Regions:
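Secondary-structure boundary elements
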Residues: 157-218
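Alpha-helix capping and helix-loop boundary segments enriched in small/acidic/polar residues
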Residues: 81-83, 220-224, 246-248
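N-terminal hydrophobic targeting signals that begin at the initiator methionine
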Residues: 1-2
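N-terminal accessory/pre-domain segments preceding catalytic cores
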Residues: 5-180, 296-399
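Solvent-exposed loop/turn segments at secondary-structure junctions
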Residues: 195-199, 204, 225-226, 251-254, ...
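Loop/turn elements at helix/coil->beta-strand transitions in domains of secreted/extracellular proteins
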Residues: 181-187, 195, 240-244, 263-265, ...
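A short, highly charged nucleic-acid-interacting micro-segment common to nuclease
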Residues: 215-229
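Hydrophobic/aromatic-rich core segments of domains that either
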Residues: 228-294
Length: 399
């Protein structure tokens, strides 16, 4: 007898320390492609061992096995099958002789495997969240079928969308010179992506269009919410041969950002928070560029911290690397003036300060008044309008 479990959305559960990544509608609308799970004795000629060189489509993501390596062996088999099915644009997934006979466990394993796959593969954007899991008793365990719904029944349309994304990726990366260091590439990709994407404003989280969660919405339509932005950064860094991971957690609602590896040290980057200052679309900031776990955890909560590498690097924090960090009261004025001088061609001034420095706004005003930095002062040169994010300050030039 065949049993069916209709999954309308991936339920947020904790299984072996792994939170389902897209359980919230803001993160969960645009998962992957067909799931097809099968072993070597099924579908002769289609089974291929999964590895990080396995290509789903022409977008050719290579850093794509981080979460795969966190799965159990059975979950890895499902994940491998998902990858093969997506590559072939197939709808029905099948697993022969799955060893776990408990239906609830099978459904959970499928969800965990799928979420790991989608977190590793930002290039997969064309399957609806709703899917069905079927189980059938067999001599060697249970056979499993997973049926997914594509966002389009037209395979040629999906392939055309992949081509559109590929062109946008090439446009962004065309000016990122290969001889540059990884940190310079990372900054340039961050800034170019922020320039091209607008944060999608919504009033009802359940009504966000599927595209706004995907690389297609971000790169082709120019709008996205957090996961669409983070997946786009993920795929661009991957193409630049910079190792990175998609991360899920919370600010107030579920949220996505990236972990990026530079010179063997990991850093957090939240491109959404660097782009989505409310009402400000004219500039990009770097308050959440290459920050440590300790720093980002003052505003963010990790959902799956135990699965992730520790991000403790400080050398390539944006403000440290650019020498936009003021470390003491004694050199505040001199350092601020150097930062202002080096930022003269920018429409904003941004820097960070040692957390022990107090009365930063007053010190800014005093320094700007003394040095006639009138382009940042308001109200008869007695006030400065600024954003304070973490330990960074962002001031928009007014003239």
């Amino acid at each position: 007898m065949k049993k069916v479990f209709i999954v309308l959305g991936i339920v947020l559960i904790l299984l072996g320390g792994f939170y389902f990544l897209w359980s919230n509608p803001e993160l969960g609308q645009n998962v992957g492609n067909s799931v097809t799970a099968f072993f070597t004795d099924l579908f002769e000629g289609k089974y291929v061992p999964y590895n990080k060189d396995f290509e789903i489509n022409t977008l050719k993501v290579s850093n794509c096995d981080y979460y795969y390596n966190k799965l159990t062996e059975d979950q890895q088999k499902m994940y491998t099958a998902v990858a093969i099915s997506v590559k072939n644009l197939e709808q029905m997934a099948k697993v022969r002789a799955y060893q776990n006979n408990v239906d609830d466990d099978i459904v959970k394993d499928a969800a965990v495997a799928m979420e790991a796959f989608f977190a590793d593969h930002p290039e997969v954007f064309y399957v609806d969240l709703q899917y069905e899991v079927y189980t059938v008793k067999s001599v060697f365990g249970k056979d499993i079928e997973i049926k997914l719904k594509y966002t389009s029944e037209d395979k040629n349309k999906i392939k055309a969308q992949v081509v559109e994304i590929s062109k946008k990726i090439d446009e962004i990366l065309s000016s990122v010179e290969s001889h540059k260091s990884d940190i310079e590439k990372e900054i340039e990709i961050h800034d170019k992506l922020c320039d091209k994407i607008k944060y999608y404003e919504y009033t009802d989280i359940n009504s966000i269009p599927l595209d706004m969660h995907s690389v297609y919405g971000a790169l082709v339509k120019g709008e996205a919410v957090c996961d669409g932005m983070s997946k786009s950064y993920q795929i661009l860094l991957d193409r630049a041969n910079i190792e990175n991971i998609l991360v899920v957690g919370k600010i107030e609602e579920l949220h996505a950002w990236n972990l990026v590896k530079i010179e063997n040290e990991w850093y957090n980057v939240d491109i959404t928070s660097d782009k989505s200052i409310k009402g400000e679309d004219t500039f990009t900031i770097h308050s959440y560029f290459n920050v440590t776990d300790d720093v980002i955890q003052s505003t963010h909560t990790f959902s799956n911290k135990e699965l992730l590498p520790e991000a403790t690097g400080t050398k390539y924090n944006y403000y440290t690397y650019k020498n936009y960090f003021i470390d003491s009261n004694d050199n505040f004025n001199d350092k601020l003036q150097k930062i202002i001088s080096s930022s003269k061609d920018s429409n904003i001034l941004e820097f960070s300060v040692n957390k022990n420095i107090k009365d930063v706004p007053d010190k800014m005003i005093s320094s700007m008044q003394s040095n006639k930095n009138t382009g940042y002062l308001t109200e008869n040169l007695t006030r400065v309008s600024y954003y304070n994010i973490l330990n960074s300050y962002v001031i928009k030039k007014i003239k």
